From Swiss-Prot:
Gene coding for it: lldP
Protein name: L-lactate permease
Main location (coarse class): membrane
Domain of life: Bacteria
Reactions it catalyzes: (S)-lactate(in) + H(+)(in) = (S)-lactate(out) + H(+)(out); (R)-lactate(in) + H(+)(in) = (R)-lactate(out) + H(+)(out); glycolate(in) + H(+)(in) = glycolate(out) + H(+)(out)
A GO CC term assigned to this protein in UniProt: plasma membrane
Organism phylogeny: Bacteria, Pseudomonadati, Pseudomonadota, Gammaproteobacteria, Enterobacterales
Length: 551
């Protein structure tokens, strides 16, 4: 087949081209907010519209377009859906063996207040998982835990998506930062430093914001000491680790420091009033569990599934383990790489999105052993043995997990199909170039480019791979620091995670809200836009006023 070159301005006017390119996204917003369609229905129609735009407007060859849709769908199944299946399976093992009652009791013994439980589980534990694994696992695990603690499913999912803003940029051992460095040629350590001078401000704001969502102004007044301890310790550790150690460990270090500081603080301080969701939508929790006399050994045993999960995911994430499966590694043959027919290197990305015409690779990687989902599955198998779960119960639990997640898995596949047709057709790059045409105001809109990238792909890493080079080029054209705008792509991207169709589908799957994706999207969308504007203001101030903050 001939090499097809992407054309980012088929209409001859970048604004008209971007309007047509935005049709699938506008439909997706409309389908969830106004039509209130189920997630899998909205995603299916969005793929159909994106495919039509790619074929009719961008003149993408039919074979290339269909191949990108199929590639995206299978990428949604592996590795994304695999992570969710394994994570939900671990949670179900904990529930089925009766250990979750003890976990619930241990958290209630620290604090019965659900606002503070959100800080411990949703923020601290979630940030740790984000640093170790990323790619949807933190939200799936923490949201399921919070539902078990009595949170309303919608609130558990929505709050976990919002609070996940703080750690995403340094997620999965700093991969988003490392990728940004690779595609721009800028030192990834410096990018991490710059992100570490933007995100700490957002961390504090996000935690106060979460308290306001849960309990209004009263919630802020009653919990501010705990928020300052949790958010302040996290922000300081995030700044110090990103600026003096590197981009790989800020989430791990910050989350552990925050968890330790908050837990010690709550031994000395509790809010004057205990807050709990009283609506019927929340599962009822027996408050006497907080006073049940479980021994330290029983509590430790109950937490073992999640300790195993933490250990295996961390092991799978460290560079020496990853190197085994990289090209030239001892176990590289265990990774099956399949070039996608009719797509691999048959589409060319063109300037100014890249510096020169570049063939777009499309290789499906079936890393059956080194995938994060497999690490979580190992944790599940260890838990089954450790907790002496009957094999028949384990098999039935895994079967019920697959059955419950069948529809969400399809949704995730269609969401990734939309992301891939957007990327390979050039649709996403058209939207990016339109934003880059805003001149000196681009410092404000720069984070929106990262936001758009994460919305489309569900990943800050993928957003940087798509748009970081464009950010650097735009920065040079308007005379501001390319380091600043590449960092803004990363920082802005974290605010798009909470409304990414992929994240919405994962969160709904984890808490049993299948078919309620529109409710969750409406819950998070306004917060996402507000946070992105905040990052835009911070970036603009750093570009023109606070230039001393740039490394």
């Amino acid at each position: 087949m001939n090499l097809w070159q992407q054309n980012y301005d088929p209409a001859g006017n970048i604004w008209l081209s971007s309007l047509i390119a935005s049709l699938p996204i506008l439909f997706f917003f409309f389908a969830l907010i106004k039509l209130k369609l189920k997630g899998y229905v909205a995603a299916s129609w969005t793929v159909a519209i994106a495919l039509a735009v790619a074929l009719l407007f961008y003149k993408m060859p039919v074979a290339n377009a269909l191949a990108s849709v199929v590639y995206g769908f299978f990428y949604g199944l592996w590795p994304i859906a695999w992570i969710i299946i394994a994570a939900v399976f671990v949670y179900k093992i904990s529930v089925k063996t009766g250990q979750f009652d003890i976990i619930r009791s241990s958290i209630l013994s620290i604090t019965p207040d659900q606002r503070l439980q959100m800080l411990i589980v949703g923020f601290c534990f979630g940030a740790f998982l984000e640093g170790a694994a990323g790619f949807g696992a933190p939200v799936a695990i923490t949201a399921a835990l919070l539902v078990g603690l009595g949170f309303k499913p919608l609130y558990a999912a929505g709050l976990c998506l919002i609070v996940n803003t703080a750690p995403v940029a340094f997620g999965a051992m700093g991969i988003p930062i490392l990728v940004a460095g690779q595609v721009t040629g800028i030192d990834s350590f410096e990018i991490g430093q710059m992100v570490g001078r933007q995100l700490p401000f957002m961390t504090i704001i996000v935690l106060f914001w979460i308290m306001a969502i849960m309990d209004g102004w009263r919630g802020i007044k009653e919990t501010w000491p705990a928020v300052v301890v949790a958010g302040g310790s996290f922000a300081i550790a995030q700044y110090l680790s990103s600026n003096f150690i590197g981009p790989e460990l800020p989430d791990i270090i910050s989350s552990l420091v925050s968890l330790l500081c908050l837990t010690l603080f709550l031994k000395r301080w509790q809010p004057v009033r205990v807050f709990r969701f009283g609506d019927l939508g929340a599962s009822q929790v027996d408050m006497t569990l907080a006073h049940t006399g479980y021994t330290a050994g029983q509590v430790l045993r109950a937490w073992t599934p999640f300790l195993f999960l933490t250990a295996t995911v961390t092991l799978w994430s460290i560079p020496p383990f990853k190197a085994l499966f990289a090209s030239g590694g001892a176990l590289y043959e265990w990774v099956i790489n399949i070039p996608v027919p009719y797509l691999d290197k048959l589409v060319a990305r063109m300037p100014p999105v890249v510096s020169e015409a570049t063939a777009y690779a499309a290789v499906f990687k079936f890393d059956w052993f080194s995938a994060t989902g497999t690490a979580i599955l190992f944790a599940a198998l260890l838990s089954i043995v450790w907790l002496k779960m009957k094999p028949s119960d384990a098999i039935s639990t895994f079967g019920s997990t697959l059955k419950e997640l069948a529809l969400p898995i399809y949704s995730i596949g269609m969401v990734l199909a939309f992301a891939f047709i957007s990327n390979y057709s050039g649709l996403s790059s058209t939207l990016a170039l339109a934003l880059a045409h805003t001149g000196h105001a681009f410092t404000f809109f720069s984070p929106f480019l990262g936001w758009l990238g994460v919305f489309l792909t569900g990943s800050d890493t993928s957003s940087n791979a798509l748009f970081a080079a464009l950010q650097a080029t735009a920065a040079q054209q308007i005379g501001v620091s390319d380091l600043l705008l590449v960092a803004a792509n990363t920082t802005g991207g974290v605010t798009g995670k909470m409304i990414s169709p992929q994240s919405i589908a994962i969160a709904c799957a984890a808490v049993g809200l299948v078919g309620k994706e529109s409710d969750l999207f409406r819950f998070t969308v306004k917060h996402s836009l507000i946070f992105t504007c905040m990052v835009g203001v911070i970036t603009t101030l750093q570009a023109y006023v606070l230039t001393w903050m740039i490394p």
